[in-house]
Every structure is written in structure tokens, then in C-alpha cells.
Amino acid sequence: MKKLWGGRFQKTPEKWVDEFGASITFDQNLVKEDITGSLAHAAMLKKCGILTEEEEGAIRQGLQTLLQKAEEGTLEFSVDYEDIHLNIEKMLIEEIGPLGGKLHTGRSRNDQVATDMHLYLKDHVSHIIVLIEQFQKALIEKAEANVETILPGYTHLQRAQPISFAHHLLAYFWMLERDKERFRDAMKRINISPLGCGALAGTTFPIDRNYSAELLGFDSIYENSLDGVSDRDFILEFLSGSSMLMMHLSRLSEEIILWCSQEFRFIELDDTYATGSSMMPQKKNPDMAELIRGKTGRVYGDMMGLFTIMKGLPLAYNKDLQEDKEGMFDTVKTVEGSLQIFTGMIETMKVNKDIMKQATKQDFSNATELADYLAKKGMPFREAHEVVGKLVYSCIEKGIYLSDMAFEEFLQASSLFEEDIYTVLDPHHAVEKRMSAGGTGFQQVEQALVKAKACAGI
């Protein structure tokens, strides 16, 4: 069949060439953005005297009919018309006649698709920011209930020092806060209109790019038409921010997976967020956390894929840019789904406070408290470190913990020890006394919750 751009050609492509080159199977996700952009373009053409009021009215009515069908899911797309733009143009012509062909005046598919993607990310990044805030609120709620819940803190996945569980959860709150700020900052680059840049050099028609940008809710326009149609840095910035967000979600997923294992038993996931085994009846697998951990690599791949596509492209538009969309769609779906799943997972998980507390009493995570105790009494910290290290070794040989040692053994190690040492070794006391700003002390955690609530608008 004859192409809308086929005037220069004597032959039509083979069907397999059409199928290979078509993007409608995935860029139909931009249908609402494409129609919305066309409505603004038509209104601008009328304002500039390029379309009459009657022409613009007919085009607007036709586009609104198509938009309603899109919302109802009744539009039928064809690879014969390659992409979302030509499919919509063909449908508009069928709806209102040859007048539909006037809509493309002063516009190219190059600036049209860039506009569609800017509109798409404007909407979805705004939604992602809302989802991050909902997840942050879930973390705050769980943290508030666990300020004095104590568990081992880890370095190298070895028990290191006792900490407040709320302190641990709030670490992720602040990571998410930075993620949120990155997305907000990215919106400055997303909220720019390329509409009217044309194929690469602008247009000879007396259009008003600022007017169409205003109608679409953009803050500004691209100052250079080559830049506006050819760069995808706004998508890369979104993918980069998404990769960092997913990295944070993956780290928490890893901890969730560990914590709900029989080796830890610190938490129990709600049945909604776990699955069983087809062979082993006893299994309760943390599949949602594992999937989020796995999908993080997928988002990394989307980012690196577009970086690789972009690195060798001369100005301006190249067909390679058809490959910029699937990774963007995939990342949006993955990020939105991961945040929604994680919010529910945190809200419904059961915290086994007693098991967490018991874990702090069956290790040497209070050894630092012992070294600090000696240092506060005047012993150089390096010497105190050596003394306590030897006490830990002695305990390991005897199969006991520091709190089990007889007071005489402490005195043999140093005359600076007094009987208050057993209070110092208590995990609750150890956490309570860590009063430095940003630390795990209960008072500091309460202050951190106040700041977190302010950031979350609670």
C-alpha cells in the first residue's frame, strides 16, 4: 500500500521490511500523548492563521473522538502505517477527510515523537515521585513502631554493633529522598518542548512554539532545533535516576530476603508477597523481593542500551532513535511496579522484635562499647582495642560472650574496669548512648523521624 511519505518512491517496501521497521507495536503506548500534542499543535496553527477556525474545530473534534477511543481501548493500529504518528494521522483522515492531512503543517515526526516522550515522562515521573513518597511514609510508619527495637548492625555481613531497627529503616528513607530529588531535578530537563523544531531546521511557517508549549504545560522550549529533535539526554537522565532508585530497592530487597530466612527470622512477610514451592510444601519464598532485586539489572540494561545507541549518532535524527522507547516504557513499568509492591511489603511485614534483640545478645557486637569504655577512662583507643580483642578471643575459646565473663577476668585485662561494665555491655544501653548527630541513639532516631515526617509532608 502507498505510504504517506511515498511520493518520492517508485517501489513499496516488502512486508517483512515494513514489519522490521515498524514501531507501532510499542510506540502505541504514546497514543494519548500523540493526540494531546496534536491538539495543541492544531490550536497553535489556528492562532497563527495557518488553519481557519472551522478547520481547527473539525480537526479538534476528530482528535477528541480518537482520544476517547484510545481511552476506551478501541483503536486498531496497523504496521502498514509504521508508527503511532502515521496511524493517528490515517485515522484522523478517515474520521474527517483530507483536512486531517493539514494537521502536519509546520511539524515533523521528529519533533512530534520527541514531544510525545517529553509528555510521557512528565506524567510518569510525577507519578513515580508520588509513589516514592508513599513508600517513604510506609518506612516512617514502620520505623515509628520500632524505635527501641534493637537488632545487630552489620559490616561485611558480620555482626558489628547493635542499632535501632528504626534507624536502619530510616537509612532507606533518606536514600529515597535523594532519589526523589533527582527525579524532581530531572523534571527541569523533561519539562521542555521540542514541538515546532521540525525535522531538524525549524519551519518556514509563522508558528508560535511558545504558545504550543504553554498549552502542553511545558516550562520552556528547546533553543536549538537540532538539539530538540536529536538528543535523548532527558530519557537517559530518567533512566539513570531510575537505576539508582532500583539499586536502593535492590539493597533493601537483599536484606528482606536475608531477614525472613530461617537463619535470621527477623521478619515475616505477609503471604501476599510470598509464594510456595511446587515440590516442597513447607516453603515460603520471598519472591517479590527477589523479583525487585532481579529487575534492577533489567533497568540497568535499559539505561546502558540507550547510552550505547546514542554514543555514535551524528546530528540530527537517525532511525536508531526508534530504539529509545522500549527501554523507557520498560523502566517506567518496572519502577512503578517495584515501588507499589515494596510499599505494601513494608506495611504488612511482621517484625520479630524478640528474635532481633536476642541476636544482639549472642554475638560480640558490644565489643566496641567495651573499647570506648576504656578509652573514656584514659586508655588510648588503640590500646583499648587490643585489650578488648584479647577478651573476645578468650570468650571464643571458652564458648561464652563478653556479658558472661566473670568480673575478675575483666580486672585481669585492665584495672580500669568497674562493675558498671555489665550495664555498658547491655545492647539497649549501647544503642541509647550513641547520641552523635545522625546516630542510632533513640533520641537521635526520634529527631530523625521528625525531620523525615517534615520531608514527607506528614
Swiss-Prot record:
Recorded metabolic or biological pathway in which this protein acts: Amino-acid biosynthesis; L-arginine biosynthesis; L-arginine from L-ornithine and carbamoyl phosphate: step 3/3
| Annotated keywords | Amino-acid biosynthesis, Arginine biosynthesis, Cytoplasm, Lyase
Name the source's superkingdom.
Bacteria
Q: What's a single GO MF annotation on this record?
A: argininosuccinate lyase activity
User: So where does this one cross the membrane?
Assistant: none
What Enzyme Commission number(s) does the record list for this chain?
A: 4.3.2.1
* Compartments in which it is found: Cytoplasm
Q: Which family does it belong to?
A: Belongs to the lyase 1 family. Argininosuccinate lyase subfamily.
Concerning NCBIfam families, the annotation shows: argH
In Gene Ontology terms, what is a biological process of this protein?
Answer: arginine biosynthetic process via ornithine
- Could you state one GO cellular component term attached to this entry? cytosol
This chain belongs to the protein called Argininosuccinate lyase
Identify the main location.
cytoplasm
Q: What reactions does this protein catalyze?
A: 2-(N(omega)-L-arginino)succinate = fumarate + L-arginine
Q: What gene is it encoded by?
A: argH
- Kindly give the InterPro entries that the UniProt entry links to this protein: Arg_succ_lyase_C, Argininosuccinate_lyase, Fumarase/histidase_N, Fumarate_lyase_CS, Fumarate_lyase_fam, Fumarate_lyase_N, L-Aspartase-like
Species of origin reads Bacillus velezensis (strain DSM 23117 / BGSC 10A6 / LMG 26770 / FZB42)
EC class = lyase
